[in-house]
From Swiss-Prot:
Active site: C149
Keyword Coiled coil in annotation: no
This protein's UniProt keywords: Amino-acid biosynthesis, Arginine biosynthesis, Cytoplasm, NADP, Oxidoreductase
Similarity comment: family membership: Belongs to the NAGSA dehydrogenase family. Type 1 subfamily.
Pathway named in the protein's UniProt entry: Amino-acid biosynthesis; L-arginine biosynthesis; N(2)-acetyl-L-ornithine from L-glutamate: step 3/4
Reactions performed catalytically: N-acetyl-L-glutamate 5-semialdehyde + phosphate + NADP(+) = N-acetyl-L-glutamyl 5-phosphate + NADPH + H(+)
Name this protein carries in UniProt: N-acetyl-gamma-glutamyl-phosphate reductase
Gene that encodes the chain: argC
Domain of life: Bacteria
GO terms for biological process, alphabetical: L-arginine biosynthetic process
Localization of this protein: Cytoplasm
CDD domains: AGPR_1_C, AGPR_1_N
Chief place where the protein resides: cytoplasm
Amino acid sequence: MKVAIIGATGYGGIELIRLLQQHPYFSIVSIHSFSQVGEHITSSYPHLRRFLVYTLQEIDVESIKKEADLVFLATPAGVSVKLTPLLLKAGLKVIDLSGDFRMVNPSIYEMWYKKPAASEEFLQQAVYGLSEWKRDEIQQAKLVANPGCFATATLLAIAPLMRNKIIEENSIIIDAKSGVSGAGKTPTHAAHFPELYDNLHIYKVNEHQHIPEIEQMLIGWNEQAKPITFSTHLIPVSRGIMVTLYAKIRKYVQIEELHNLYTNIYKNAYFVRIRPYGEFPSIKEVRGSNYCDIGIGYDERTKRITVVAVIDNMMKGAAGQAVQNANLVARLDEKTGLQYIPIYP
């Protein structure tokens, strides 16, 4: 399948290039940028020398449709709202890494993103691309809304509990921490080295834009779902997300039952690895890979469950899951081109 990448010079776009250039069935036919048209990609990213000969092109749908079958949009929020309808009308399939098509309700998008929403016509076409839980829908989709990085880790961690109504819906607390690449390529004060190094920032407390897409999925799994408490932190590493979920158990359950629940639910999910009871993952153990590692603990004294999930925010949290979804759209094995061993140490 021939693919194009729009927004190729951001961190998500560069990770897509790395994965797709090594993919056995996808071929990159063009890469596109808003600000660096005419430049060679290696002028910004010298590590790609010898691997790529692409020059960044302007975004012209007519030209793209002559070469590509599928387009990856690695653009900021508010951009794909305008581009996606044009691409779909041109007969192209789209994997959108932004948040523009994740929400079913346009007013909720506008409330959280402070931008005009896409039309309901196209929002209804979009399939939320949480690969492990939406495989069948993704295979039929023309437009896949790739989930946010925090949302991916959170939803994979909480899905077995919510779907089986094991926890009290009003007791969910999520403590999420991300490496600085999650803040994007554009420099910010919080991501400035003297501010970030040897420090820890909390930001967007209960205001992060991934909250509504998490709650949207929770309601779909359990109609009794309530708003969640969700905090995000910036940590001084380049890649990685750790989500720690706390919730009160509805009735007494043995930890072995909880562990078996996760193991059975994810037994056919290649990229979800459940740790043995009492063992919890670290972000370095998934770095550079498409894996989500999950550890489960239960405090009988407080009747609370603790679930820890880690992902690489650039892989399972962005480009890796986008390629996984593209594999599904192309009716390939979803593991194709993604079986990278994590980089360690």
